[in-house]
Each structure stands twice: as C-alpha cells, then as structure tokens.
C-alpha cells in the first residue's frame, strides 16, 4: 500500500471503519483463534480441513485488519460544509440527468471505503464521480465511462 495515498472519507465513513476494526479485533479475531485451537485438537493437521479453513480465514481477517488500519491512518476527512454549496465533492449528494432527456438520478459521493452503490453511495474513484467532482449546479459535463461518454446536467448539489 502506497504510504502517500490518502483516503478521502466523511466523518461518518471514518466512524464506520473504526467500528469495523473494533469488531474485527474484539469479536472475529478471538473467534477464529478459538476455531484454530479446536481444529488442532483433532490431531493430524495434514488432512485437517477445519484447521486449513480456519487458517485461511485468519489470513483474510488479518489482511482486512491491516487494510482498515492503513485507511484510518491515512484518512482525509472531507468537511463538505467548507466547500462551495453548489460544487460537487466528496460528502455531497448530487442530482443530475443524462442529456438529452433521461430521468434525474441522485448519488452521494463518498470515499472508496464507504461506497455502497446499492444505497446510492458512489466512490469518489468511480468514473461518474470523477467526472462530476469540481463541477457546479447547472453545468453540463461530459463524463468518460467504460461504455463511452455520457453528457449530464447537474441539477442540484447538497450536503449529505
């Protein structure tokens, strides 16, 4: 992981990551350690699928812990209240419509750590967010997406 990369996120996103880290350390880690102990008690580890499974889960868990710790260490909290209220940025809800005549869509732009497209939270690293960030209400913006280029008009920007 690059040491100089920051992870833009809202305060809410940071709190969510802190809670996840606490759960990983306090609940999940001891549970997996206990499963490893139980699997060891079965004897021969060379053919012990429970042991192998628990060790694999432990490896995934420890990697997730390291990732979350790194993201929190290099978190850049975005205070959307300090950004022009008409400018699209992390922590803002943006409503736009694809031109010429599509229905309006609204998304909250968040850091990658808190993105959840199923609930309308898109990562600042996504093509749509990258194309919108820095633009203002009433602007028409050409956005490069994997399927080509889409032109949108920004209708509204508000704090999340």
Curated annotation (Swiss-Prot):
One example GO MF annotation: RNA polymerase binding
Gene3D superfamilies: Transcription elongation factor, GreA/GreB, C-terminal domain, Transcription elongation factor, GreA/GreB, N-terminal domain
Protein name: Transcription elongation factor GreA 2
Function comment: Necessary for efficient RNA polymerase transcription elongation past template-encoded arresting sites. The arresting sites in DNA have the property of trapping a certain fraction of elongating RNA polymerases that pass through, resulting in locked ternary complexes. Cleavage of the nascent transcript by cleavage factors such as GreA or GreB allows the resumption of elongation from the new 3'terminus. GreA releases sequences of 2 to 3 nucleotides.
Family note: Belongs to the GreA/GreB family.
GO biological process: DNA-templated transcription elongation; regulation of DNA-templated transcription elongation
Gene: greA2
Coiled-coil annotated spans: 9-73
Alphabetically ordered keywords of this record: Coiled coil, DNA-binding, Transcription, Transcription regulation
Domain of life from the UniProt record: Bacteria
